[in-house]
Each structure stands twice: as structure tokens, then as C-alpha cells.
Amino acid sequence: MLRLSPPDREKLFQSPRLRVIFGGGEANVAVSLATFGHAARFITAVPKHEVGDAVVNELRRWGVETGCILRQGKRLGIYFAETGANQRASKVIYDRDHSSIAEAKPGDFDWDKALDGIDWFHT
């Protein structure tokens, strides 16, 4: 997923700037495992355009295996994250409808290849 968040503790629509980070729970787990020297393979679907390329390259940069990532669909899921301040709680707004992974079907994946040699499958 693509995370968009305002700098510091600004509110989402208070700031003219947004930081761009690729992440999401499952991606964060894969990156953490790879960082600690474990083999990690990421299984998902991302768009076949420059944004999808950037996601795959970011995962590879951290040592995550990306050979089972499908390149299909037209959009990457997005989430907007505001960091809370004082009495204001943090807030997350998800925009995942019609993303590549949301529209992927189980039969789109080569599960024999994806699960080959896998001891643990995290969802």
C-alpha cells in the first residue's frame, strides 16, 4: 500500500505536503524478517506501471523476494495517516477499493511456486 501522511503532527488537510512511504502490515512484516536475515517472500498484486515498479523496488531494496508479485490492475491501495497530537488521536483513512490486490482472484496466483519452501505464511 501507499502511505500518505502530513509531516510532523499536522492534520491531513492542514498541510500542503504529504510524505510518501510504501508499507502496510504484511509488507512491514516481510521487510522486518528480511532485515533480521530471514528469507521473506511477498505475495500480492500491484499495478503494472511506475507506482507498481516503485513498490517492487522498495521491497527488493530491503531484501524481500518479489518473484510472486502479480503485475495487474490499475491502482495501488492507499492509506492516509495522521499522527495524533495532545488530545487528538491518530487517524487512518483507507482507500483500497478496486486496487490490484482487491481485484485479484486466488486462481491468478501460482500457489505451488509461491508456497514452495515456505515454513510460515503470514496474512
Tell me what each language-model feature is:
Residues 2, 26-28, 55, 80:
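Short, flexible micro-motifs
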Residues 13-23:
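Short pre-catalytic strand/loop immediately N-terminal to key active-site residues, enriched for Gly-Thr
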Residues 10-14, 110:
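A glycine- and small-aliphatic-rich helix-loop capping segment at beta-alpha/alpha-beta transitions
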Residues 39-123:
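Conserved N-terminal subdomain of the carbohydrate kinase-like
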Residues 1-11:
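Positively charged, low-complexity intrinsically disordered leader regions
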Residues 30-39:
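Alpha-helix C-terminal capping segments
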Residues 22-26, 51:
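Conserved donor sugar-nucleotide recognition element shared by glycan-biosynthetic enzymes
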